[in-house]
């Protein structure tokens, strides 16, 4: 948190959204690839959106970034894919354009009063029991940390750690092996990073090497869910 406060608003917000910082990414890449991308800064996408917002305050600019990146390219995409996979047309009523316009007109001080979703919590007072109205936000996170010790363990070892793994041309194998061992032993949790490596390997096989044997990017998750259900 202090590290994010030491930089400009856009950079700080971008760092707070990231699951890996630039130093960790560079450590994970092979020296050759790290040199190639040395001048690339992924946070430029955050800065561009932040600067596009004409609101004068930091909070509104951060919310604009969240709508453009975290919402549009993240949560909504995943929910839509998951819904359509089961024949469901998912709707997001609180993203109705009139509701969004109203939300943007709410003064910043009121948006932040009372903690997260303060205004919404006040609206439902008396309509929901107190424990529901005041509880912490709960999302639908994928249990990657557990999966890589269970149903995704073999896949990672066979595809990412294999001597002939395509992803080896991108990454430092020693660093990858270290974080894998840290994860398995419980010293640290690296679920999101390990998943990125699985996806990088699949992407490389599909788009750079034209491998017809490559499964779709969602196959690992589907297989993990299937195996997890079998275990349960």
What residue ranges belong to the model's regions?
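Adenosyl-5′-phosphate
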Residues: 2-232
């Amino acid at each position: 948190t202090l590290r994010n406060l030491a930089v400009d608003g856009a950079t700080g917000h971008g760092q707070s959204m990231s699951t890996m910082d630039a130093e960790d990414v560079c450590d994970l890449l092979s020296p050759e690839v790290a040199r190639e991308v040395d001048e690339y800064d992924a946070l430029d996408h955050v800065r561009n959106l932040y600067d596009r917002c004409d609101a004068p305050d930091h909070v509104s600019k951060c919310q604009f970034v969240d709508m453009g990146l975290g919402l549009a390219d993240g949560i909504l995409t995943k929910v839509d894919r998951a819904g359509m996979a089961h024949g469901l047309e998912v709707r997001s009523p609180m993203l109705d354009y009139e509701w969004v316009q109203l939300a943007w007109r709410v003064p910043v001080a009121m948006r932040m009063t009372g903690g997260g979703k303060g205004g919404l919590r006040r609206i439902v007072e008396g309509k929901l029991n107190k424990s529901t109205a005041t509880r912490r936000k709960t999302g639908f996170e994928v249990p990657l940390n557990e999966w890589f010790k269970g149903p995704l363990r073999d896949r990672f070892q066979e595809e990412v750690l294999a001597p002939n793994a395509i992803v080896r041309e991108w990454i430092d194998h020693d660093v990858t092996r270290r974080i894998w061992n840290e994860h398995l032993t419980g010293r640290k949790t690296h679920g999101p990073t390990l998943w990125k490596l699985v996806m990088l390997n699949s992407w490389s096989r599909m788009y750079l090497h034209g491998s017809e044997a490559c499964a779709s990017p969602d196959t690992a998750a589907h297989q993990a869910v299937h195996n997890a259900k079998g275990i349960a």
